[in-house]
Amino acid sequence: MNQASYKNFLATIAPPASAEVLGKWGITTAQLLTSKVEELILPIFNEMDPNEISIYAVGGFGRKELAPFSDADLLFLTTERIEISNTIAALWDLGIKPSILVRKGGELITSVKRDLKFATTLIDARHLYGFELPLLLGPKEWIEKARPWFHREQEYERRIRLLKALGAGCQEPNIRDGRGGLRDLQLKHWLLKISEKHEMKSDSESRENNNILLGARTAIHLAVKRREDRMLLSDRRQLISWLGWENEDSFFQSVMLAMKRNAYGKKKKSDNRKHLVEEFKSRLRDVPLRPISGFLRLLDETGELELLLPEWRRIEGLVRTDSAHKYTPDEHTLRVIENLEALFQTQNNEINLSYLQRHDLLILAALFHDIGKGTGKNHEEEGTKSAVEFTKKFGFTKTEIERVSFLVRNHLLLSYNAFRRDIDDPHLIHDLAKKIGDVENLIMLYLLTVADLKAVSYTLWNDWKARLLDTLVSRLVRQCSSYLPPELFAKEAIIRRKATVEDLLSNSKSAEYISAHFDSVDGRYALAHTPEQIARHIQLIPELKKNAVVVERNQHPVSNCIELVVITHSHQGLFAEIAGTLSALDFNILSADISTRSDGVAIDTFRVSDSNNIDSSRWNSFVEDLKEVISGADNVENLLNKIMPYKKKSVGIKTEVSVEIDNESSGDYTIVEVMLPDEIGLLYRIASVFRNCEMSIATAIINTESEHGVDVFYVTDNSGKKIVKKNLLKRLKEKMLEIA
């Protein structure tokens, strides 16, 4: 049989019929693959002298747990040095990937003492060809003598392995190497084999979990046609298509639950719900003096949390398609509660946390905030229903129930508006404050938001997002206390900023410039910029008398990025020109703020990251290129064409493509949300579509952190009004989708 026929054999393997038979299918298929590989390789071994060599199947091959594209682990024991290169080449020609260890028979004991990996391979050694060594028969006396060493070395190896591989509770676990994966089960199997009672058998649940993971690993290999031991979201569609199951979630949830059971051991069975409820009530009353997260995690590990909260079983091991989430909803929820307890012990210089009085209600909201994800419906509303039912049964008052319900229903409110809406818009601040109601609601929602974001993944939360959220909440605290109309809120912001700027620029010559400047800007500009930034704008604007474009760069005081300020005369397509020039010099744009004075002076601020650092040469190139583009001496397309041949597009999860238009949230602007695959010059092409549709960008919120980032634009027509014509909005969507 040649390599092609082996691949044809793999193509004949039918998928399991359902999650219920995944384990049985997994072990049966692994044994079938093992037998097939043995059938292929034994004729090759028959050409060797059986008196000179002994060949053993080891590792997964030795256990008869072979996966389609995993290595066939072989141990060659020889009496003398012999030539095996032709044998190895013949194995590769079959389409089998051999992993071969070669030892002289007399070197075995020395190798075992020196090499833990080699020692463990011998535990499952299975004779295939040639002479047999008595040392590899029966219980492993040779390793029993070194049992303490074996335990110690295996634990060290496991700690190193788990640092590299995601496991139970993670959305994209490594089924082989992660916590609760096949390697953990193999370790348990090895320890049983070398225990004092080596005849003791592993429990049936461990065997079933092992078989489920074998089935999952085999299914992934066959579906994606390569060795892949991780359950990647990018492979999900291909895997679902190969399986052909009606219930798409059942495969992933079966795997996650098997890994969870492996990680925590056998679940306890308890029918004493009354005692459990009383203990939960007692611990909830003691928050924050006595943490409750450890108690809840223990209930989760023992399987008793679903006795307290039946909806919990729906989210256990549930894998969602959102690649931003590192953890499954059950693990994520427990981490949110742990994060809250940490926040209870911290101080925030920007936000006064003393408004928080009911820590217990916040813990309850965290427990229910994602519980609705198990229904497949709107998880905020479904979670709210569950929270209301639970708190009623537990005897909470109407006011307490309403507060918990508010938090669950609106747990995404602050993050959505902080990162996908213009927080410098006075109308937004007014509307949000009205919806939130009081400062205690706000502070509880703020803490829940921070804990939630930190529990999504360790990369999602950063200083920049913390600053945006703190800025929004600080403004909302003020608004919830005063309830100023948007116009007065904006006017107050201008007055406060102007007074501070006058202190910064305290000379008679500046007074005239300051008054003229604040007379020509709006409240949004005053909120968007610090007094120090505004003072610098006032100093730079007079330079327009000498130069058509004034450009300055500064290190941002909070986030690790560079702030570029471009001051020039406003014109159609200015945003596209700046964005395109930045892209052509390989700057990564994080955010952009576009402000235009009533006299037509544009003050545009771009925050960019640059892994290559901006040296004086690159900075001068940017300034010169921008001047030429704005003057018409050059164009962005020419600049981009110079670097495109040298830049590669990144390959990752298939990005959803969408363009959404919101004409309800803002009184003055049409909000356009764009989700397109990231590439060099994308922001320029998006801006060019707006320009070609005769629309002006007022604000841009750029998301560059994940494949599913949404860029948000506040736009108007050329007369500064919202875009309401349906045919123009339809054309905008069509043109945006054309650049995908």
Regions found by a protein language model. Name each.
Residues A4, P16, K145-D271:
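Conserved nucleotidyltransferase catalytic core and NTase-mimicking acidic/glycine-rich helix/loop elements
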Residues M1-N51, F69:
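N-terminal regions immediately upstream of nucleotidyltransferase
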Residues S35-Y56, W190-K201, A324-L362, E382, ...:
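Alpha-helical phosphate/pyrophosphate-handling elements in metalloenzyme active cores
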